[in-house]
């Protein structure tokens, strides 16, 4: 059974990690996938990889500035115009920082909030414009377990992810009247380039705090996105699902 057959789906941060895993799993399940990435070069590389894996599938790719509503709307609009609708929006793009509080500059904090919060807000806002008249759709926002429990360092990242959780719950309650569901996913420690780019001492701390004694794989998170985007999750909205292997920062 293809859980998202013919569902028009956009995945931000879709060129690597969780987003790229989601792109593959959604294609495997019949979705019409478009990916957003940070640069056109990254997008083109990911598109080439997907073309090799799925030569019969047409996957669109864009590199809009997620902090610009106009730029995001232009890209989202191209997808909706091509297919006549938008069914699923996965706001997955994000950045991290582990600077301790005393070393976080105003510019660094603002940048994290711009990408992780404003980017999600813009993605959700633009998706809503394409879904409201059809009165159906699913918006999935990537949060983090650190947005629930905090972290030992790097206040900007958990602050931004807590904001994503609040945005998700509030928006989910507001627009369910339009039959549009909004759900958050809060991953724990996932085996991605972003995670593995942390300093060795932070990676060591992660592994000690993992009851499963391993990091989660991107596909384990993407499978939850797949379920939430499907009709099997028709009663789930305005909440955040933790996929963390019992990890507590």
Curated annotation (Swiss-Prot):
The keyword Cell membrane is annotated on this UniProt entry: no
GO molecular function per UniProt: 3alpha-hydroxy bile acid-CoA-ester 3-dehydrogenase activity; bile acid binding; NAD+ binding; oxidoreductase activity, acting on the CH-OH group of donors, NAD or NADP as acceptor; steroid dehydrogenase activity, acting on the CH-OH group of donors, NAD or NADP as acceptor
EC number: 1.1.1.395
Induction data: Induced by the C24 primary bile acids cholic acid (CA) and chenodeoxycholic acid (CDCA).
GO BP annotation list: bile acid biosynthetic process; bile acid catabolic process; bile acid metabolic process; protein homotetramerization; response to bile acid
Residues forming the catalytic site: 157 (proton donor/acceptor), 161 (proton donor/acceptor)
Record keywords, A-Z: Lipid metabolism, NAD, Oxidoreductase, Steroid metabolism
Effect of residue 42 to A: Improves utilization of NADP(+) as cosubstrate by 10-fold compared to wild-type. Displays 6-fold increase in affinity for NADP(+)
Pfam families with a match to the protein in the record: adh_short
Catalytic activity: a 3alpha-hydroxy bile acid CoA + NAD(+) = a 3-oxo bile acid CoA + NADH + H(+); choloyl-CoA + NAD(+) = 7alpha,12alpha-dihydroxy-3-oxochol-24-oyl-CoA + NADH + H(+); chenodeoxycholoyl-CoA + NAD(+) = 7alpha-hydroxy-3-oxochol-24-oyl-CoA + NADH + H(+); deoxycholoyl-CoA + NAD(+) = 12alpha-hydroxy-3-oxocholan-24-oyl-CoA + NADH + H(+)
Alphabetical list of PROSITE patterns matching this protein: ADH_SHORT (PS00061)
Description of how the protein assembles with itself and partners: Homotetramer.
Miscellaneous notes: There are three genes for BaiA proteins: baiA1 is identical to baiA3 and encodes a polypeptide sharing 92% identity with baiA2 gene product. Reaction mechanism seems to proceed via a nicotinamide-OH(-) adduct, which is proposed to be involved in proton relay instead of hydride transfer.
Protein name: 3alpha-hydroxy bile acid-CoA-ester 3-dehydrogenase 2
Organism: Clostridium scindens (strain JCM 10418 / VPI 12708)
Gene designation per UniProt: baiA2
